[in-house]
Amino acid sequence: MSYGIVTEQIATFDTELRLESGRILGPIDIAYETYGTLNESRSNAILVTHAWTGSAHLAGRYSEDEKRAGWWDEIVGPGALLDTDRYFVICSNVIGSCFGSTGPTSINPKTGKRYNLAFPVITVRDMVKAQALLMDRLGIGKLFCVLGGSMGGMQALEWATQFPERVGSAVVLATTPRPSAQAISLNAVARWAIFNDPNWKKGEYRKNPKDGLALARGIGHITFLSDESMTAKFDRRFSARDGQFDFFGQFEVERYLTYNGYNFVDRFDANSFLYLAKALDLYDVASGCESLEEAFAPVTAPIQFFAFTSDWLYPPAQTEEMVASLKTLGKQVEYHLITSAYGHDAFLLEHQTFTPLVESFLDRVKV
């Protein structure tokens, strides 16, 4: 059952945000949605941070006839993991994206035209600094919890390390302290796909470079799955529409990737895809520090980590490295390795595997 009807809101900030690169971005719009009610002491707010191609549309529908609910609808609502009878849940779109927050599709106030590649390179840390502005606007001094998976988990880590006084707890799923060379190389190939689409025009396109973006999405989508899940869903079955010996005949998995890729281009912008891919590749929770221990030294909040056995994009060993560093420092840390065949996307597809563990963790949080 869906959460119900929701409304997206836009917060505009006339301030200028100094980015990690040293460049200035402003004014800034941040798209966000809220669920539940902020209590009188303003102490029950949970910020959910989205992954690479996510949005602020966490749960519910914008109208009765909308076919798809928000991207994590199942965990939000009365009696759900993020119980809206108990918590005030917030989800905001990151800067650099194309779902309402300031990004390369936004109008550059200096030129009156779209930023496109004039938009500055942004980092996950910059995303979180922008979110802090939103929390200030909402009058929330300290969050009960920050919860996110993948790039959302990176944001949760940044909250815990950069704003420790503002975080009561963090739940981090399927993430990494820093993407590996393999993860970066896969994003590099996805970038090439867009760069080599003649319709990209060095970012100055009027129509989305669909072929390049669809291919880039296909590459990315493979990294979100696992061999086990792909075998279970497709195996080596040949498409019933094609002759096996037709030169352009496709396996079912090929048709799936084609459909998924071209469906994606109708809802996402190519330049935003590139900017967020760059932010992922640049991510390092220990940026500016000599070690993970130095990076995690400011942490005061308890952190609950989840890794998934078949996640080969951000494998469990990368989460375990962070857990070990936090334990060395004597921090409050909890770790669960979830057996799953669904790869990196397990945190989105199998929330029931970790829901009771997160509920128990949140019950023990003191803010």
Curated annotation (Swiss-Prot):
Q: Where in the cell is it found?
A: Cytoplasm
This one is known as Homoserine O-acetyltransferase
GO biological process terms, alphabetically, are: homoserine metabolic process; methionine biosynthetic process
Q: Which InterPro entries match?
A: AB_hydrolase_1, AB_hydrolase_fold, HAT_MetX-like
- Membrane-spanning regions, if any? none
Functional note = Transfers an acetyl group from acetyl-CoA to L-homoserine, forming acetyl-L-homoserine.
Q: Which residues bind substrate?
A: R217, D345
Pathway of action = Amino-acid biosynthesis; L-methionine biosynthesis via de novo pathway; O-acetyl-L-homoserine from L-homoserine: step 1/1
Q: What is its EC number?
A: 2.3.1.31
- Tell me which UniProt keywords the record has, alphabetically: Acyltransferase, Amino-acid biosynthesis, Cytoplasm, Methionine biosynthesis, Transferase
* Coiled-coil stretches: none
> Which enzyme type, at the first EC level?
transferase
- Catalytic activity annotation: L-homoserine + acetyl-CoA = O-acetyl-L-homoserine + CoA
> What is said about its interaction partners and assembly?
Homodimer.
Q: Which residues form the AB hydrolase-1 domain?
A: 44-350
**Which Gene Ontology CC terms are recorded?**
cytoplasm
| Active-site residue numbers | S150, D311, H344
Mention one GO molecular function. homoserine O-acetyltransferase activity
Q: Which domain of life is it from?
A: Bacteria
Q: Which SUPFAM superfamilies match?
A: alpha/beta-Hydrolases
Q: Which organism is it from?
A: Citrifermentans bemidjiense (strain ATCC BAA-1014 / DSM 16622 / JCM 12645 / Bem)
The UniProt similarity line reads: Belongs to the AB hydrolase superfamily. MetX family.
